[in-house]
Amino acid sequence: MHLKGRSMLTLLDFAEDEIKFIVDTALQMKRENYAGRRYWGLLEGRHLALLFEKPSTRTRVAFEVAASQLGMSVSYVTKSDSQLSRGEPLKDAARVLGRYVDAIAARVKRHEDLETLVEHSGVPVINALSDKFHPTQAIADVMTILEKLGRVRGVKIAFVGDGADNVAHSLALAATSLGADVRIVTAPGYEPLDAVIAAAEERARRSGGSFELVYDPCKGVKGADVVYTDVWVSMGLEAEREKRLRDLRPYQVNSELLKCVGKDYIFMHCLPAHRGEEVTEEVLESSRSVVWDQAENKLHAQRAVLALLVP
């Protein structure tokens, strides 16, 4: 399957078979990496720009390591240390970066800024997190589910917390594409974007999976194979902190809520975790938690995305 030259702003732009191909490639590259068969030099001579407007630990380092492993060189640029901080239009910066580099991975406050980069740079742009989507995280998430449970089709995934979260959006699109039964367990007013709901329902219909919104936290996690949460106060939403903590408190993933599952399950979190808010220390550090393996898979997912998209 040929994906060279494509951008990845959202998984809405990728068909179900393309998402499966990316996940399968990431798993294959991970296995071969551990077997000593490396992909060093696959993108020798290419250059990646990391254009980050928000802080990052895992995503930034994973892109830097993945690019290096593939033979790429990397330039890390933040808004504060570039002319963007002095008012240079993003489209002007995009025009120049597109003449210097072979691809851009960008972490932005406004998803629309990614579209500006695509329009004016002329090179593949990869969403390293926006206010609406986090597609490379979803690739890592599906990888983790496949590794831990052996399948995605028919797996019951309960995402608990802020249903309008960028990770929730991308997970719903990726998992329903591969036949999972996805529940977004959230409070009224925190539902996913209408476009995400419509796309997830359509993908679930085609794949044999399902998608639903559940407002009761105990009912939402009942029978789940995967219980997943993310922070309640995403970057840029700090002004809403107290309201969000109050509204989402009943959706904390703790030992009491997990009694409602009633079966074996795994716990997932994209990190960083705010212990005592969306999840308790006990759950995060439990034997059912796979968050550290999940975090490692960000490296393998992002390496596959670079290998497949960068010309």
UniProtKB/Swiss-Prot annotation:
Localization annotation: Cytoplasm
Pathway: Amino-acid degradation; L-arginine degradation via ADI pathway; carbamoyl phosphate from L-arginine: step 2/2
Residue numbers binding L-ornithine: 166, 230, 234-235
GO biological process annotation, one example: arginine biosynthetic process via ornithine
Protein family: Belongs to the aspartate/ornithine carbamoyltransferase superfamily. OTCase family.
NCBIfam families: orni_carb_tr (TIGR00658), PRK00779.1 (NF001986)
Function: Reversibly catalyzes the transfer of the carbamoyl group from carbamoyl phosphate (CP) to the N(epsilon) atom of ornithine (ORN) to produce L-citrulline.
Protein name in the entry: Ornithine carbamoyltransferase
Species of origin: Ignicoccus hospitalis (strain KIN4/I / DSM 18386 / JCM 14125)
